[in-house]
């Protein structure tokens, strides 16, 4: 706890008081190159904190960093049908069958492992539903 106390009570105030912040608008034009370089780190920190707060609290910003989400699960399989329904008779299943739940498979309705790449890209944990006889 003592290092944090020293940082907050001594180091940070000393650093901030040593920054070359002018008293007037005209003073900004009189800053040297070295003074401008000294102002870069706190400016980057303030901008980063502001941007992080913007992303966290502004709903419009949350979709701008990642792909726009349409809310759809199925972006590929039988789009011409109003509802995708597959009926599979349990007697037709030999020992077990894996069915897709991620809508990424090329072998619909069976799972071909496409969810693995989807999980790596998005951090998701979707997998197939496995039916055993």
Curated annotation (Swiss-Prot):
Co-factor(s): [2Fe-2S] cluster
Transmembrane segments: 36-58
Keyword Cell cycle tagged: no
Side of membrane Lumenal, spans: 1-35
UniProtKB keywords: 2Fe-2S, Endoplasmic reticulum, Iron, Iron-sulfur, Membrane, Metal-binding, Transmembrane, Transmembrane helix
GO biological process: intracellular iron ion homeostasis; mitochondrial transport; regulation of autophagy
Pfam families in the record: MitoNEET_N, zf-CDGSH
Intervals, Cytoplasmic compartment: 59-133
Entry's localization field: Endoplasmic reticulum membrane
Recorded GO CC terms: endoplasmic reticulum membrane; mitochondrial outer membrane
One function term, GO molecular function aspect: metal ion binding
Membrane topology: Single-pass membrane protein
Main location: endoplasmic reticulum
Positions bound to [2Fe-2S] cluster: 100, 102, 111, 115
Segments forming a coiled coil: none
Cofactor annotation remark: Binds 1 [2Fe-2S] cluster.
InterPro entries reported in the protein's UniProt record: CISD1/2 (IPR045131), FeS-contain_CDGSH-typ (IPR018967), FeS-contain_mitoNEET_N (IPR019610), MitoNEET_CISD (IPR042216)
Family recorded in the similarity comment: Belongs to the CISD protein family. CISD2 subfamily.
Protein name, per record: CDGSH iron-sulfur domain-containing protein 2 homolog
Species: Drosophila erecta (Fruit fly)
């Amino acid at each position: 706890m003592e290092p944090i106390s020293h940082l907050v009570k001594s180091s940070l105030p000393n650093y901030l008081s040593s920054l070359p912040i002018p008293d007037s608008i005209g003073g900004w034009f009189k800053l040297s190159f070295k003074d401008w370089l000294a102002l870069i780190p706190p400016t980057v920190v303030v901008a980063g904190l502001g941007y992080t707060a913007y992303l966290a609290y502004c709903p419009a910003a949350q979709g701008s960093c990642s792909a726009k989400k349409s809310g759809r699960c199925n972006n590929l399989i039988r789009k011409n049908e109003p509802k995708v329904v597959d009926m599979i008779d349990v007697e037709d299943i030999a020992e077990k069958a894996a069915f897709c739940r991620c809508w990424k498979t090329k072998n619909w309705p069976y799972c071909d492992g496409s969810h693995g790449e989807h999980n790596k890209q998005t951090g998701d944990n979707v997998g197939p539903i496995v039916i055993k006889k």
